[in-house]
Amino acid sequence: MKVTVVGAGNVGATCADVIAHKELCNEVILVDIKENFAEGKALDIWQTAPVNMYDTRIKGSTNDYSKTANSDVVVITSVLPRKPGMSRDDLISTNAMIVKTVTENVIKHSPKAIIIVVSNPLDVMTYCAYLTAKI
């Protein structure tokens, strides 16, 4: 089984770490738009494998969705975070575009994947992914 986590920030990296540590799949792909960010996080997680006694493969990628091909599950965590004083609605249009782009890439490379959205505002981002995936 292959799981992709899109977004290597705190939520995404923690999600990838837990999935790998609990051996919920054979391979975790961590993707982020920031250059070398996902690769670094994946390497950090992978290097804990011997100590934590798991053998899940984990790899990072900078925006190369071809590495996510044939994922069984994709977790979308990538959006811009809220800054102090912002409401959850302030970033809807920006975050919707991010989720739309990510979902299009997911469908292109893993059309049968189960998509889990963990991006705020959650209800709107989930609906955006649903519409984009044309489920």
Located regions from the model:
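Glycine-rich Rossmann-fold phosphate-binding loop(s) that bind the pyrophosphate
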Residues: 8-9
